[in-house]
Amino acid sequence: MSKESRIFIEISENIIDLNYWYKIVSDDSSGATSSFLGTTRNEFKGKSVERLEYETYEPMAIKEIEKICKTILNGFENDIKKIGIVHRIGNVPVGESSILIVISSGHRKSSLEAVHYAIDTIKSTVPIWKKEFYTDGSENQWKGNCESCHFNNNNHPH
């Protein structure tokens, strides 16, 4: 199985189907499947959030996510089985998910560490922007990726 046949990436306006993505990375040789599901929360810095809107330059976003996946496969060559990453674009209401990362591996440590690496690196390198829409109609702002997440160990909110 080539590395490319172990990587599954999608940018989509559709609601993320967890079961579909878990099936994609399912592998008889894996003993663990780890995931991260990013969800739109209802507040940010005390302001009530209605929804998020995501935009991207899709070819570049996919290329950057592929690089991240290949780095993961090279770093855990004998243990990572498959990687699935889907990121939504367009409107994502409160309670719905904007990103899912699912990674299968022979052992739990590898997939847990790989998921952590993937989300931090996606947020710091992939050209995806979000705009928060507040319930009070106050000014909405476009926000880029959190540049310091991957390089700074501070525990700050996204």
Curated annotation (Swiss-Prot):
HAMAP family: MOC2B (MF_03052). PANTHER family: MOLYBDOPTERIN SYNTHASE RELATED. The keyword Glycosyltransferase does not apply. Catalytic subunit of the molybdopterin synthase complex, a complex that catalyzes the conversion of precursor Z into molybdopterin. Acts by mediating the incorporation of 2 sulfur atoms from thiocarboxylated mocs2s into precursor Z to generate a dithiolene group. GO terms for molecular function: molybdopterin synthase activity. GO terms for cellular component: cytosol; molybdopterin synthase complex. Substrate binds at H107, R108, K123, K130, K131, E132. One of its GO terms (biological process) is Mo-molybdopterin cofactor biosynthetic process. This is Molybdopterin synthase catalytic subunit.
